[in-house]
Regions:
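Acidic, metal/ion-coordinating pockets
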Residues: 2-23, 30-400
Length: 400
């Protein structure tokens, strides 16, 4: 509230004589004008620097080495949408091997060779369902197997992700914390070291610049304490709204849903698996789209699920397994995967989409082909009716 000026305490009827005005010389007036102009120039320069144009710091946790409890997000306004479309390629669960089941030859450098041509876009996003760490697991101790599974590859394997074309990785999932806090720090450090942004720890938003001056914000969700919690839908909505103030395009990637071929359909209520809550997948996806997300990408069930459109935005409920070197079952539907390729307008509006089908070998290595387009088309029709995405035989995706 503005403070009221003090009342005049002088006795009534007496006036303080006004000071005599001094004549200002022409030279003095010129000096004063010059000083004012200099001050205006300095203020303008400071404002430009503060706005961050041309040198905006990354508003992801790109330089952090541990998850933080609070949002690591600048309170900025989203820049105006650029004039060019934005392309994105995104995939599901990715594990490059773990010592207990065997690491791939050549340090994993050939794992993505068969699908690298599909991983093209201004933003290439994946779900890193493992740690990049060494030593014994914080979850399973010295070994995995039986009822405990822990996944980690050496930190040097981050180079394989970079070489494949990934620009952002989500570490919001049930295996990212298999090596505990130290493993999470190691993972983030390894990704930072090769220039890959990350999202997933509580409150984090990865923001990636795109050609033409655009920006894409990516929010990662999972139903775990070390992630932005997918069970807290109001919290997810708040984070998406914050992301929408930072970038004109917002993508949500979420590790939710029960696992296995029995769970290819998206239920209307909450999902559980082995007694563990796995989120209200349908309600979560629709809520974040209503809050401003331009694309929702799910993973976690280890199988493909259907797709729908809401408010003109695409929801892909699960992209299944993408790479699981000797760690995933690849029989039946678990071996069918895909690369989702989407073109969005500068404001996030859906322009075009394609599901490029991928199949996994018995060792979990991806290559083009398979039946995922046919499977997803059928699931979309069965689960979503009038809002179902339409998939052509070649994988092209169009709204209903």
């Amino acid at each position: 509230m503005a403070r009221r000026p003090p009342r005049d305490s002088r006795p009534p009827g007496r006036r303080t004589p006004l000071p005599r005005r001094r004549r200002t010389s022409t030279r003095t007036l010129q000096n004063r004008i010059l000083a004012v102009l200099c001050m205006v120039a300095v203020v303008g320069l400071v404002a430009v620097l503060a706005s961050g144009r041309g040198g905006t710091p990354e508003v992801s946790t790109a330089n952090a080495e541990a998850p933080r409890a609070s949002a690591q997000v600048a309170a900025t306004t989203a820049p105006a949408a650029g004039g060019r479309d934005v392309t994105l390629a995104t995939v599901g669960d990715t594990v490059m091997g773990t010592p207990e089941f065997g690491l791939p030859p050549a340090g994993g450098s050939t794992l993505f060779n068969g699908v690298k041509p599909l991983l093209k876009g201004d933003v290439v996003l994946g779900n890193l369902e493992q740690a990049l760490a060494t030593g014994p697991s914080a979850k399973c101790g010295s070994g995995s197997g039986g009822s405990c599974y822990a996944f980690a590859s050496p930190p040097s394997y981050a180079r394989n992700l970079k070489a494949a074309g990934f620009t952002v990785m989500s570490i919001a999932n049930n295996h990212a914390y298999d090596w505990g806090t130290a493993g999470m720090r190691s993972t983030i450090r390894a990704l930072n070291g090769v220039g890959i942004r990350h999202t997933g720890p509580p409150g984090t938003i990865a923001v990636q610049p795109t050609p033409g001056g655009g920006r894409v914000a990516v929010v990662g969700l999972a139903p775990y304490s070390w992630s932005q919690n997918a069970l807290d839908i109001p919290g997810a909505v708040r984070l998406v709204r914050k992301a929408a103030r930072m970038a004109p395009i917002v993508v949500v990637t979420a590790h939710v849903g029960a696992e296995g071929s029995r769970y290819r359909n998206v239920p209307r209520g909450a999902e559980t698996y082995l007694g563990e809550p796995r989120g209200e997948t349908r309600r979560l996806a629709r809520a974040v789209v209503d809050a401003g997300a331009d694309l929702f990408v799910g993973h976690g069930p280890h199988v493909m699920r259907g797709m729908e459109f809401r408010n003109g935005r695409l929801i892909a409920y699960s992209l299944g397994n993408f790479l699981g070197y000797k760690v995933f079952s690849t029989s039946g539907y678990a071996g069918q995967s895909g690369v989702l390729q989407v073109t969005m307008g500068p404001d996030g509006a859906f322009k075009a989409g394609r599901l490029a089908p991928v199949r996994l070998s018995s060792s979990g290595i991806p290559s083009p082909g398979g039946t995922s387009v046919r499977d997803v088309a059928a699931l979309s029709r069965a689960n979503f009716g009038s809002s179902a995405a339409r998939l052509a035989r070649g994988g092209a995706i169009t709204p209903p």
